Curated annotation (Swiss-Prot):
This is 2,3-bisphosphoglycerate-dependent phosphoglycerate mutase. Belongs to the phosphoglycerate mutase family. BPG-dependent PGAM subfamily. The lineage of its organism: Bacteria, Pseudomonadati, Pseudomonadota, Gammaproteobacteria, Enterobacterales. Pathway: Carbohydrate degradation; glycolysis; pyruvate from D-glyceraldehyde 3-phosphate: step 3/5. It comes from Salmonella paratyphi A (strain AKU_12601). The gene is gpmA. GO terms for molecular function: phosphoglycerate mutase activity.
Amino acid sequence: MAVTKLVLVRHGESQWNKENRFTGWYDVDLSEKGVSEAKAAGKLLKEEGFSFDFAYTSVLKRAIHTLWNVLDELDQAWLPVEKSWKLNERHYGALQGLNKAETAEKYGDEQVKQWRRGFAVTPPELTKDDERYPGHDPRYAKLSEKELPLTESLALTIDRVIPYWTDTILPRMKSGERVIIAAHGNSLRALVKYLDNMSEDEILELNIPTGVPLVYEFDENFKPLKHYYLGNADEIAAKAAAVANQGKAK
């Protein structure tokens, strides 16, 4: 049976991950640790014999720079790459820039958990005159006003990620090309929920660690057979737990 592999990588730690702030569509770069995580992901993939024909990422530099570092370690810096806003992180609305722990102290751990992980829960909206509104950013100039979020739930994130998967990424895989996606915690959670047919309760508890390759294997009908992280299992579990704890009051 022919097995097709797909690699997903959440960007390495960003400067705002380090500062425990809601990031969303804000274009913050990788921290030094994040660069190291991205390079380590590339080394792991090289050790396991991976190489790729095409890469996808978002239009946010923490994901783009993660992909650059991964491909550099694979000696595949030349690889064709498609960047799409549809792979962007979930938009956190008026929470963008706020410290997660301080927000939890103000609103409570459970409210912040729902804002971060709830399926259909949207954080408070931005207003269009807010400098954080994506309509002020030239990279989104070709998007319609309807496509520009004031805030997003995971459900709304799924509404943009999954059509991009089915219409753009999956056909390339079906043509025989080997694909890697470097994206974000929530855009990848959206894809994982779809691939694994997870319930809303199950996705609430899913935390994807930064800078760790997640491999999916598909059968000849492109149904997922299994998935697994590359690397030390204890270290990966600790990183996922750290992601879960970011939204708790100190």
